[in-house]
C-alpha cells in the first residue's frame, strides 16, 4: 500500500523521499520490530523516543517513517514524513493498513475508572450464550476470541497501541467475530489509540480519582474519557448516577442511561445484596423484569445494568439477557471468591483506587458476620497521593490490615507502606507490614477463622509482580489456592 494512501486526507510534510512509495511489509512503532519495506512510526514515550531510532529502523529495512519533529540526521534511502502528532497519524495508517476491521463488527467500547473488565466480561458472557458467532474481547486479561487467548502480543495492559490494536481487530474479524468488546483506558483515549476503531456503542461506567500520575488533574482525566463520546462512537450507554453523565448527554443527547438513584432508561429498584449475589427489579420501557446476578454489591448491579443496556443495543431481548446474566461465571480477579478449610471467605479483587477499594470493602463489611482482614498495597512509580487515603479507607472498614507490596517497581516498598500507614493512624484497625506479598497473604489466611472475610486487593487477575526491573510471576488467587490446599 502506498504511504500516501495510508495518510490520505491527513496533513503531512515530506522531509525526504517520495510518499508514493509502496509499504509492503507492515507497520511498527518499535524499531526493533521493523522489517523489510515497513513503515516505522516514531512515537515519543516515557523512557525512549522513537525519533532517536530512525537509523535502526532503516537498517532493519523500513522504507518510510512518520515523525513529529525534524531529526538532525535523516537516514539515506528512507522516506521521512512529518506530521503534527505521530500517534494520531499512526491510528489512521494502522486502521487503513488492516482494512479498517472495526467497521466489520459491532464494537462495544467500555470506559470508566472502575468496572471496565467486569462489564466487558458480562457482555462477552451474554453474547456468547445468545449467539453462535465467537465473541472477541480486548482488555486487561489480554485479547481473546471465543474464550480462547489470541496469540498476538499486546503493547499495553488494557488498550493496545494503535498498530497492535488494529492487528488484533483484524484477527478477530478474520476469525468471524461479529461482536467485539473492548476496554478503553483513559491513556488510550488521550493518545488517540482508538480513533479509528469505529465503535458502535460506547459504555461509560463511572469516574473517580485515579491515574493522576498520567493526566495530572481530574479535569484532564475526565476530558480524556469524554473523547470517546465526541465522535468516536455511534451510540452511548451512560451511568446516570455519575455526575459526568450530564456532560456526555450534552455531547450525545440520544445516549441511553442506566442507574439506581436517578431516572434512567434501565433502572434497578428493590435491590437486595447478599454474599451470593444481588437481586433487583429492572425497570425499562414501562415494564418490570426480575433480575439476579451472582455478583454481590451495588457495583455488581451497576455493571449488570451497563451490560444489559449494551446487549440490548446489540439487538438481544431483555429477558434473554437477564437469563444469561443469572448464569454468569466468576470473573477472574473481580470479586472472585473462595472458601478456606477454616471456614473463612477470601475475596480477590482488582480494587486499586480509593473509590474501588471503598466500594469493595463496604460490600464485604455489609455481609460480614465476623472480622474483615484486608491485604493490599499501592503501586510504585504511580500516583502517591492516593496512598494515605487508601490506608484510611482500609482502616475504617477492616479489623486487621496487612500492608504489602503491589508492583513497587523502582520505589522502596517500605517507603510506600510508610505513606499508606499515615492514613491508617487515625483508625481503630490493627495493622501489620509484610512486604513479601505471598507471606502477607499467608499471614492473613493463618489469622482468618470461621466467618472471617479476607479481601486481597489491588492486583486482581494480574499474573506478575513488578519489583525493580524484574517481572516476577505472581497471581493472587493462585497463591490463595496454593496456601489453602496445604
PLM-predicted stretches and their roles:
Residues 9, 71-77, 174-175, 182, ...:
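Acidic, Mg2+-coordinating active-site environments of NTP-dependent enzymes
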Residues 1-92, 96, 243, 267, ...:
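N-terminal leader/targeting and accessory segments in enzymes
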Residues 67-70, 184, 206, 240, ...:
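Short secondary-structure boundary segments
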Residues 16-18, 67-69, 84, 139, ...:
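Short loop/edge segments at beta-strand edges and connector loops
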Residues 89-240, 246-253, 368:
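Phosphate-binding loop of NTP-binding sites
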Residues 6, 38, 57, 93, ...:
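Residue-level signal for inorganic ion chemistry
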Residues 1-15, 34-39, 49, 128, ...:
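ATP-dependent carboxylate-amine ligase
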Residues 72-74, 143-145, 188-190, 243-247, ...:
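Short, active-site-adjacent cap segments at secondary-structure transitions
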Amino acid at each position: 500500500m502506498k504511504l500516501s494512501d495510508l495518510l490520505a486526507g491527513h496533513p503531512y510534510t515530506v522531509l525526504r523521499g517520495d510518499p508514493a512509495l509502496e509499504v509492503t511489509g507492515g507497520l511498527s512503532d518499535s524499531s526493533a520490530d521493523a522489517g523489510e519495506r515497513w513503515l516505522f512510526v516514531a512515537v515519543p514515550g516515557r523512557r525512549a523516543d522513537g525519533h532517536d531510532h530512525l537509523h535502526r529502523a532503516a537498517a532493519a529495512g523500513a522504507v518510510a517513517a512518520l515523525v513529529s519533529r525534524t531529526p538532525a540526521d535523516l537516514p539515506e534511502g528512507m522516506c521521512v514524513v512529518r506530521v503534527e502528532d505521530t500517534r494520531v497519524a499512526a491510528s489512521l495508517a494502522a486502521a487503513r493498513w488492516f482494512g479498517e476491521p472495526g467497521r466489520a463488527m459491532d464494537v462495544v467500547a467500555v470506559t470508566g475508572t472502575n468496572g471496565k473488565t467486569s462489564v466487558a466480561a458480562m457482555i462477552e458472557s451474554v453474547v456468547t450464550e445468545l449467539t453462535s458467532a465467537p465473541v472477541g474481547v480486548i482488555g486487561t486479561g489480554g485479547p481473546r476470541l471465543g474464550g480462547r487467548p489470541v496469540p498476538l502480543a499486546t503493547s499495553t495492559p488494557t488498550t493496545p497501541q494503535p498498530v497492535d490494536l488494529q492487528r488484533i481487530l483484524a484477527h478477530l474479524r478474520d476469525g468471524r467475530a461479529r461482536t467485539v468488546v473492548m476496554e478503553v483506558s483513559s491513556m488510550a483515549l488521550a493518545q488517540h489509540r482508538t480513533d479509528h476503531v469505529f465503535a458502535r456503542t460506547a459504555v461509560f461506567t463511572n469516574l473517580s480519582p485515579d491515574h493522576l500520575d498520567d493526566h495530572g488533574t481530574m479535569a484532564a482525566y475526565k476530558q480524556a474519557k469524554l473523547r470517546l463520546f465526541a465522535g468516536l462512537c455511534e451510540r452511548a450507554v451512560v451511568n446516570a448516577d455519575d455526575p459526568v453523565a450530564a456532560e456526555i448527554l450534552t455531547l450525545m443527547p440520544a445516549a441511553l442511561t442506566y442507574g439506581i438513584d436517578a431516572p434512567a432508561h434501565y433502572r434497578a429498584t428493590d435491590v437486595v445484596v447478599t454474599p451470593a449475589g444481588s437481586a433487583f427489579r429492572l425497570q425499562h420501557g414501562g415494564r418490570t423484569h426480575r433480575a439476579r446476578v451472582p455478583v454481590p454489591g451495588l457495583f455488581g448491579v451497576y455493571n449488570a445494568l451497563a451490560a444489559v443496556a449494551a446487549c440490548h443495543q446489540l439487538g438481544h431481548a431483555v429477558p434473554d439477557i437477564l437469563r444469561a446474566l443469572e448464569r454468569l461465571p466468576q470473573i477472574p480477579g473481580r470479586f472472585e471468591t473462595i472458601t478456606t478449610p477454616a471456614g473463612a471467605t477470601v475475596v480477590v479483587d482488582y480494587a486499586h483506587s480509593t473509590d474501588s477499594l471503598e466500594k469493595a470493602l463496604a460490600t464485604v463489611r455489609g455481609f460480614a458476620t465476623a472480622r474483615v482482614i484486608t491485604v493490599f498495597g499501592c503501586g510504585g512509580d504511580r500516583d502517591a497521593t492516593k496512598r494515605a487515603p487508601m490506608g484510611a479507607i482500609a482502616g475504617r472498614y477492616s479489623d486487621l490490615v496487612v500492608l504489602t507490596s503491589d508492583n513497587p517497581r523502582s520505589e522502596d516498598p517500605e517507603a510506600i507502606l510508610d505513606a499508606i500507614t499515615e492514613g491508617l493512624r487515625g483508625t481503630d484497625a490493627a495493622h501489620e507490614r509484610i512486604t513479601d506479598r505471598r507471606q502477607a497473604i499467608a499471614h492473613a489466611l493463618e489469622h482468618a477463622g470461621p466467618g472471617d472475610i479476607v479481601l486481597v486487593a489491588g492486583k486482581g487477575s494480574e499474573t506478575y509482580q513488578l519489583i525493580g526491573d524484574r517481572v516476577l510471576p505472581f497471581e493472587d488467587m493462585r497463591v490463595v489456592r496454593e496456601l489453602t490446599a496445604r
